[in-house]
A protein has these predicted regions:
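Positively charged, polar, low-complexity stretches
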Residues: 2-103, 114, 132-135, 140-144
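Short, glycine/charged-enriched secondary-structure capping and boundary segments
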Residues: 50-52, 105-108, 124-126
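Helix-rich interaction surfaces within compact, conserved domain-sized segments
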Residues: 100, 118-125
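Trafficking entry modules
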Residues: 107-118
């Protein structure tokens, strides 16, 4: 099943959380169910806040993993792979580590910011996927 997972790297992203919010909204509007993986509780809280303030006109339905409504809510936010995740369409990774459970998802988006430390972690994740015989694609934000 792992070889069926498509991995897309989006690099050179100026605001990682805002970008992840827009990507999740776009995927939701296309009918997908999404899990957003944060690196820690502080990043998870920031991601949750960013979802609420994404747009004054759009509501992006989301809950934290473990919420009783998680299975019915199209976007689930988590900072742990240990919790039960109800969705398996798309994983948006904003953490600096490769997700161990990537193979549960049809598609993984790796979001890499312009920060040098984050870019270095992104390169390590790219190599990690290559070692798993996956062929990640690379999209540079801001370039067409």
């Amino acid at each position: 099943m792992a070889d069926m997972t498509r991995v897309d790297f989006h690099t050179n992203v100026p605001d990682k959380l805002a970008y992840a919010c827009r990507l999740a909204r776009k995927a939701y509007m296309a009918g997908n169910k999404i899990v957003v993986l944060a690196g820690n509780s502080a990043q998870l809280d920031a991601m949750n806040a960013a979802m609420w303030t994404l747009s004054p006109t759009d509501f992006v339905p989301h809950v934290l993993a473990g919420d009783p409504l998680a299975a019915q809510t199209p976007i689930v936010l988590t900072d742990s792979e240990e919790v039960e995740l109800p969705h398996h369409d798309i994983l948006v990774n904003v953490s600096q580590l490769p997700p161990e459970n990537y193979a549960q998802f049809q598609r993984v988006f790796e979001i890499v910011s312009t920060d040098e430390q984050d870019a270095q972690a992104g390169r390590q994740r790219f190599l990690h996927y290559r070692k798993l015989n996956l062929q990640p694609t690379h999209f540079v934000a801001g370039k067409s």
